[in-house]
From Swiss-Prot:
Membrane topology qualifier: Multi-pass membrane protein
Keyword Transmembrane helix: yes
Protein name: C4-dicarboxylate transport protein
Organism of this sequence: Stenotrophomonas maltophilia (strain K279a)
Parts of the chain that traverse the membrane: 22-42, 52-72, 90-110, 159-179, 199-219, 232-252, 325-347, 366-386
GO cellular component: plasma membrane
Gene encoding the protein: dctA
Length: 447
């Protein structure tokens, strides 16, 4: 069984004005113009962006549940589930840690906060107080307990990705364990996949409206001028994120036989949607569909993508250490090697506790600084004004990181159709045959 597309691939491309990525580009430009020249009107466009993100969040839980349950239930060897999950977590841990280290190295080399000579006692802490309060809930035990929903229904009502993932994995395993008795249920769930993904395609038609509203609000409320004073920090973050994707993830992609830039081109509509809404969740359903279409096993996609949205946040991790050291430099706070190692270890844990939290990057930073008292939490007031502009870059980097992870784990598992991948990345989707879930369940684990 495979995730169906809404319609067969056309023999020739649609006119550019009918393509989603072009419509989103136009919407972003128009939103930026409105926000810049009519900021009061721009701020009032916020409900458009919020409404679109809510529409997407509405469908995320069913997409994850159906994809994972049908993927696991169709397996004949359940140990495959554990093997794929273990490989995914190993990948996430390595590259998340690497992203934290990269952010720390760049902060030392570029020194974005040096020379500011800010006195933390003179900063207005009221603006960051709400974020600090939310950060108190981000403990490791609290995070682990939050994975288990109070009821089966509450996970879907709250839209908690990790809870839906937890239920889907357990239900998929249970369904596979009962054998033929579970076939009618499996067939029913497989039949539901088509209308659910058709609904995804319908909702995506509203993407330009959502992107327009979100960008108009951002520019209208914060203004491009707010970037000037902290342009060095923002520029350093964007450059670091680009180098992480182009160099580190680029090398990983090359070793796996494809180009990260071609992958980004293949996902251009989704990337523009993430840019416009500043939310990687807004493109989650489309990412799952397109990764399977590009030759990744349905079973791997169903496990890796939703899990990666909580455990593989490369952009957020780069931001955390870079921003923390920026605050230390700006406030003339000396950090020993021991302090920085402690900061790294705390950030590794706290970054996992922000899954599904609005403003996750800023809240996670508050949680990290609260545990590392050497860096003044009050210093967060310095970056509050430009955090919204760094949010887009965090989301884009997180999104690309999860797309790369899906391909890498699929290849590692021997479940990647390389011919389909190359056709998709070369823009020859019209030549693609229907996808087949090629997970080699009966084979022993590789590498």
């Amino acid at each position: 069984m495979h995730i169906p597309t809404a319609a067969p691939a056309p023999a020739k491309p649609l006119p550019i004005y009918r393509q989603l990525y072009f419509q989103v580009i136009v919407a972003i430009v128009l939103g930026a113009i409105l926000g810049h020249y009519e900021p009061l009107i721009g701020e009032k466009m916020k409900p458009l962006g919020d409404a679109f993100i809510n529409l997407v969040k509405m469908i995320i839980a069913p997409v994850i549940f159906l994809t994972i349950v049908t993927g696991i239930a169709s397996m004949t060897h359940l140990r495959t589930v554990g093997r794929v999950f273990a490989k995914a977590m190993a990948y996430f841990l390595f590259f998340s840690t690497l992203a934290l280290i990269v952010g720390m190295i760049v902060a030392h080399v570029v020194q974005p906060g040096a020379g500011m000579n800010i006195n933390p006692a003179e900063l207005d802490q009221t603006a960051v107080h709400s974020y600090v309060e939310k950060s108190h809930d981000l403990t490791l035990v609290g995070f682990l307990m939050d994975i288990i929903p109070k009821t089966l229904v509450s996970a879907f009502v709250d839209g908690n990705i990790l809870q839906v993932l937890f239920i889907a994995v357990l239900f998929g395993i249970a369904l596979a364990s009962v054998g033929e008795k579970g076939k009618p249920i499996l067939n029913f769930l497989e039949a539901l996949v088509a209308p659910v993904f058709k609904l995804v395609h319908i909702l995506m038609k509203a993407a330009p409206i959502g992107a327009f509203g979100a960008i108009a609000f951002t520019i209208g409320k914060y203004g491009v001028g707010s970037l000037v004073n902290l342009a060095w920090l923002v520029g350093s973050f964007y450059l670091t994120a680009f180098l992480f994707v182009a160099v580190i993830l680029g090398v990983v992609c090359r070793l796996c036989g494809f180009s990260v830039f071609k992958l980004a081109r293949y996902l251009k509509a989704e990337l523009l949607l993430v840019l416009g809404t500043s939310s990687s969740e807004s493109a989650l359903p489309s990412l799952m569909e397109k990764m399977e279409r590009a030759g990744c096993s349905k079973s791997v996609v169903g496990l890796v993508v939703p899990t990666g949205y909580s455990f593989n946040l490369d952009g957020t991790n780069i931001y955390m250490t870079l921003a923390a050291l920026f605050i230390a430099q700006a406030t003339n706070t000396e950090l020993t090697l021991g302090h920085q190692i402690a900061l790294l270890l705390v950030a590794m844990l706290s970054s996992k506790g922000a899954a599904g939290v609005t403003g996750a990057g800023f809240i996670t930073l508050a949680a990290t600084l609260a545990v590392v008292p050497e860096v003044p939490v009050a210093g967060m007031a310095l970056i509050l004004g430009v955090d919204r502009f760094m949010s887009e870059c965090r989301s884009l980097t997180n999104f690309i990181g999860n797309a790369v992870a899906t391909v890498v784990v699929s290849r590692w598992e021997g479940a990647l159709d390389r011919n389909r991948l190359q056709l998709a990345l070369d823009g020859r989707e019209s030549e693609l045959p229907p996808p087949v879930d090629a997970l080699p369940e009966a084979l022993p684990a590789k590498g």
